[in-house]
Amino acid sequence: MSDGIVIIGSGFAARQLVKNIRKQDTQIPLTLIAADSMDEYNKPDLSHVISRGQKADDLTLQSAGEFAEQYNLRLFPHTWVSDIDAENRLVKSQDNQWRYDKLVLATGATPFIPPVPGRELMLTLNSQREYGAAQSQLHDAKRVLIVGGGLIGCELAMDFCRAGKAVTVVDNSASVLAALMPPEASSRLQHRLTEMGVHLMLKAQLEGLEQTADGIRVSLDRQRAITVDAVVAAAGLRPETSLARHAGLQINRGVVVNNQLQTSDPAIYALGDCAEINGTVLPFLQPILLSAMCLSKNLLAQAGELKLPPMLVKVKTPDLPLHLAGDTRRDDLTWNIVAAKEGLVAKGVDGENQLRAFVVSEDKMKEAFALLKQLVS
């Protein structure tokens, strides 16, 4: 007997897929398997839990049981999938197996932990479960070091600072948000973080961590060191591809899919942070929403093709929020930047003066949707 459509994962991508399927078909069998509790929470809230004084349980929006009842699902929480037998269409755990008609991998991404001595001392905040394991240490910590000055690193740095902690950010880039935008566009946020008291150690290389009587001693290049109470790894995410690899699927940075979200095995699909679409991994909410809508149609034998319009990426740093869109890291762009008290507008134009990317901050974020319409992709 088949378990119908089987989904591995229970995060935002999996839940959006379930909701879209159930809008179109209330009876087709849906089976979800995940290693976590399968309770729903809003993952972006993890960037603000410390300043809000929240505990992990405070984030729960809906229990797994309520989710199963509302959407007519079979759920298998706290279940580690050990193997996918693609030839026989079987998903296996240590104690169970499920036969699928179609399989969806919504396995997400895992935090990158820099491979340095003492790496086991680093905390991660990529899930409600991870925060639950780290919350006591983080709330008690007076001195926090964040490894990584990207999107999540900047959000966490501001949040910890707003909670009254002494915050240091270490990154080997010359500016914050280096993977998202040029320094001309990120300098305003960088200045604001410094104003708030965040110690930015840029162009710095992490070399190791060691537990001492006074805390965690963090060694950096050029014989520098700092002692803190907690170290948080925010150095990026790696798509979780191990199951897909074992199943013989094509892997590049993520699980390679076509415009139908179909992998190299026509019965297996991938969605969310683990999927690589047109050579790109898009770990943001809007592409996941659009991908879930498209995939629901394909799983129900309706033709759906994913077309991604220009989309906003939001940097949730409350004291200086930012929106960006387009190919902000293109080397051939000229940046026209207007900075005023109420915010920044940075436009990246190509040699033909066509708008290819932009960054807006604070009150200028209201111009984002008009700029989106002008973007040339």
From Swiss-Prot:
It is found in: Cytoplasm. PANTHER family: NITRITE REDUCTASE [NAD(P)H], PYRIDINE NUCLEOTIDE-DISULFIDE OXIDOREDUCTASE DOMAIN-CONTAINING. NCBIfam families: PRK04965.1. Pathway: Nitrogen metabolism; nitric oxide reduction. It comes from the Bacteria. Its main location: cytoplasm. Its cofactor is FAD. One of at least two accessory proteins for anaerobic nitric oxide (NO) reductase. Reduces the rubredoxin moiety of NO reductase. One of its GO terms (cellular component) is cytoplasm. It catalyses: 2 reduced [nitric oxide reductase rubredoxin domain] + NAD(+) + H(+) = 2 oxidized [nitric oxide reductase rubredoxin domain] + NADH. Gene3D superfamilies: 3.30.390.120, FAD/NAD(P)-binding domain. GO terms for molecular function: oxidoreductase activity, acting on iron-sulfur proteins as donors, NAD or NADP as acceptor. Keywords: Cytoplasm, FAD, Flavoprotein, NAD, Oxidoreductase. The gene is norW. Belongs to the FAD-dependent oxidoreductase family. This is Nitric oxide reductase FlRd-NAD(+) reductase. Its EC number is 1.18.1.-.
